[in-house]
Every structure is written in structure tokens, then in C-alpha cells.
Design a protein with these regions (language model features):
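Short, structured motif recognition centered on aromatic/hydrophobic residues
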Residues: 6, 13, 23, 47, ...
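Serine-centered coil/turn micro-motif
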Residues: 63-64, 109
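Hydrophobic side chains in well-ordered alpha-helices
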Residues: 19-22, 90-94
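Long, hydrophobic N-terminal alpha-helical segment
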Residues: 1-40, 64
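N-terminal strand-loop-strand beta-hairpin
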Residues: 28-49, 53, 117-119
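A short beta-turn/loop motif at secondary-structure boundaries
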Residues: 37-39, 72, 107-110
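Vicinal oxygen chelate
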Residues: 2, 6-14, 45-48, 67-136
Length: 136
């Protein structure tokens, strides 16, 4: 499997409205996009730090994965996303190496990226997202 860089860190928050001021006022970053990803039942806010982004994830439904994560673990880092090319190939390679896949088939994520998650039991306890920008 080949990845090029950390695309973003996903951080679970209860409220974007409450979380954004910390990133903007305390850290001096600018929120450049807010987007709802309906099929994942989340609303996201993005900040850029160098080549990497921070993605804040607010649940839009009590039965969303993020709402359940916050209920069980509290707010904080939810996942690490790694940029790659040929995501289908990367998933096949990961599976061939015994990595458990949350998503066997890539799907659409925020910012128009094609994404797939690897199970944390196979990735040293870190929920790992592969991201490909098919518009490049």
C-alpha cells in the first residue's frame, strides 16, 4: 500500500458553532469550508495547516457513527486520513496483507474525495481513512 501524506485529521465535536472559535481565535486558523455529508450524517468544517487539513465532524443525527463515537469516547481525534492514488488498488493491497476493511468499496466523502476506511483493529488502534482526489 502506498500513501503520500496525511490528508487530514478528523476530530469529533458536539457542535461546530462551539468548536470553530477555538481553531480560529486561539490557533489563528481559518475555516475555509463547511459541508454536510448527508449519507454519513455529519456536518464538517475544514481548516488547513500546511499540506494537512483538520476536519471537524459534528453529528447531524443521534444514530450517526460520530454521535455514537462521542457518546462512547467523548470528543476528540476520531480518525487519520491518508492521501493515496488508485484507492481501489490500495484497498486490494491492504486486504491482501490481512488488513480488515470497513469499506471494501470506496465511497464519496467530504470535499468530493473518494474515501474508504480501514478497521482500527488492523491499523494499530487508529481508524484510518484512505482518500483519493479523483479530480486531480
Amino acid at each position: 500500500m502506498k500513501v503520500s501524506h496525511i490528508e487530514h485529521l478528523g476530530i469529533a465535536v458536539k457542535s461546530l458553532e462551539e468548536a470553530i472559535p477555538y481553531w480560529e481565535n486561539v490557533l489563528g486558523l481559518k475555516c475555509y469550508a463547511i459541508e454536510e455529508v448527508a449519507d454519513q450524517k455529519v456536518k464538517t468544517a475544514f481548516f488547513k495547516i500546511g499540506q494537512t487539513k483538520i476536519e471537524l465532524l459534528e453529528p447531524t443525527s443521534e444514530d450517526s457513527t460520530i454521535a455514537k463515537y462521542i457518546e462512547n469516547r467523548g470528543v476528540g481525534i476520531h480518525h487519520m486520513a491518508l492521501a493515496c492514488e488508485n484507492i481501489e488498488e490500495q484497498l486490494a493491497d491492504a486486504e491482501a496483507q490481512g488488513v480488515r476493511l470497513n469499506d471494501k468499496t470506496p465511497r464519496k466523502g467530504a470535499e468530493g474525495l473518494t474515501i474508504a476506511f480501514l478497521h482500527p483493529k488492523s491499523t494499530q488502534g487508529i481508524l484510518t481513512e484512505l482518500c483519493e482526489d479523483k479530480n486531480k
